[in-house]
């Protein structure tokens, strides 16, 4: 099938100004916004995700925000399914979808497709792997992965718990390494779309300033109180995907400690800042490798980006 349906992908590292640009474009009335963010999907996780306020979402509605609780799991495959359905619905209205966010795995899965024959998640197998980790430690689980799938073992770290679980899960269900299956299996790519990729890549020094400002605001408006409320409401633990989100992981570790001294709090804030910078670095690297992409230095040429997108799709 020929590519006929335009889709705008508005990408960028955390704190790069993606949402502001997307909202400015939305005001023209010919677009709908689809969030591409693995943290914004969670209800009640607002401050640490820099989620648009209820008032902002009323003015600039986003699909795929607040769709599950922090106890639930949401995969890249589910994102592709949900996003493609929304893209088709938006086109049926005569509008153009703008996918805006910084979760590069979601963008990669949409652009390149997913392996179609990998087994679905199995709750019993996953529970058995997590029980093994609880009893023997994650190093033991990682060592098992390295034995059955050396390629995955070389790629993953012991801290990559969800990726380790998925790789071992696939092996136990199929008897084959996940890396072998991924290399052999056909991809399901939505060829009916024409993707127009735009990446906001600000100067790194300026981006680091924006990240520091965002985190300072996060702490000052009650982020720790938010995480405390989440713990009480949902009985959260650090094995949940929601609690591996940058900021939440560090805050959860701090709040579960017996010693919440000033020094430990400062250490927690430093760890969150470092993790956020590392996330931005990974996002930056992936975006630079993406072909057929228009790049903008956010703080110097955002008007150029707005004008270019308006002229093309407004």
Curated annotation (Swiss-Prot):
Positions of region (Interaction with substrate tRNA): 37-40, 162-166
Keyword tRNA processing recorded: yes
Cofactor list: Mg(2+)
Purpose of the protein: Catalyzes the transfer of a dimethylallyl group onto the adenine at position 37 in tRNAs that read codons beginning with uridine, leading to the formation of N6-(dimethylallyl)adenosine (i(6)A).
Description of how the protein assembles with itself and partners: Monomer.
Name under which the protein is recorded: tRNA dimethylallyltransferase
Gene encoding the protein: miaA
Domain of life of the organism encoding this protein: Bacteria
EC number(s) per entry: 2.5.1.75
Residue ranges the record marks as coiled coil: none
Residues holding ATP: 12-19
InterPro entries xrefs: Dimethylallyltransferase (IPR039657), IPT (IPR018022), P-loop_NTPase (IPR027417)
Keyword Amino-acid biosynthesis: no
Swiss-Prot/TrEMBL site (Interaction with substrate tRNA) positions: 103, 126
Keywords recorded for this protein, A-Z: ATP-binding, Magnesium, Nucleotide-binding, Transferase, tRNA processing
Catalytic reaction list: adenosine(37) in tRNA + dimethylallyl diphosphate = N(6)-dimethylallyladenosine(37) in tRNA + diphosphate
Biological processes annotated in GO: tRNA modification
Organism: Acinetobacter baylyi (strain ATCC 33305 / BD413 / ADP1)
GO molecular-function terms, A-Z: ATP binding; tRNA dimethylallyltransferase activity
């Amino acid at each position: 099938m020929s590519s006929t349906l335009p889709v705008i992908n508005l990408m960028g590292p955390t704190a790069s100004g993606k949402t502001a640009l997307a909202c400015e474009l939305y005001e023209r009335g010919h677009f709908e916004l689809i969030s591409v963010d693995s943290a914004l999907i969670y209800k009640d996780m607002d401050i640490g995700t820099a989620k648009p306020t209820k008032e902002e979402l009323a003015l600039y509605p986003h699909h795929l925000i607040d769709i599950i609780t922090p106890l639930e799991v949401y995969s890249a495959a589910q994102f592709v399914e949900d996003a493609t359905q929304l893209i088709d619905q938006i086109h049926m209205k005569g509008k153009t979808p703008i996918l805006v966010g910084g979760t590069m795995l979601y963008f990669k899965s949409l652009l390149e497709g997913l392996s179609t024959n990998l087994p679905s998640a199995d709750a019993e197998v996953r529970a058995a792997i997590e029980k093994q980790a609880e009893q023997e430690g994650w190093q033991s689980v990682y060592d098992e992965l390295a034995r059955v799938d050396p390629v995955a073992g070389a790629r993953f770290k012991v801290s990559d718990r969800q990726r380790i679980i998925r790789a071992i899960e696939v092996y136990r269900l199929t008897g084959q390494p996940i890396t072998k299956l991924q290399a052999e299996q056909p991809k399901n790519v939505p060829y009916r779309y024409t993707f127009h990729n735009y990446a906001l890549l600000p100067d790194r020094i300026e981006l680091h300033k924006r990240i520091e400002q965002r985190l300072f605001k996060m702490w000052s408006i009650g982020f720790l109180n938010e995480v405390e409320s989440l713990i009480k409401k949902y009985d959260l633990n650090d094995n949940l995907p929601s609690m591996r989100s940058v900021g939440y992981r560090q805050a959860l570790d701090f709040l579960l400690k017996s010693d919440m001294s000033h020094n430990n709090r400062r250490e927690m804030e430093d760890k969150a800042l470092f993790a956020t910078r590392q996330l931005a670095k990974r996002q930056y690297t992936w975006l630079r490798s993406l072909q057929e992409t228009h790049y903008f230095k956010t703080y110097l040429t955002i008007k150029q980006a707005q004008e270019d997108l308006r002229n093309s799709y407004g």
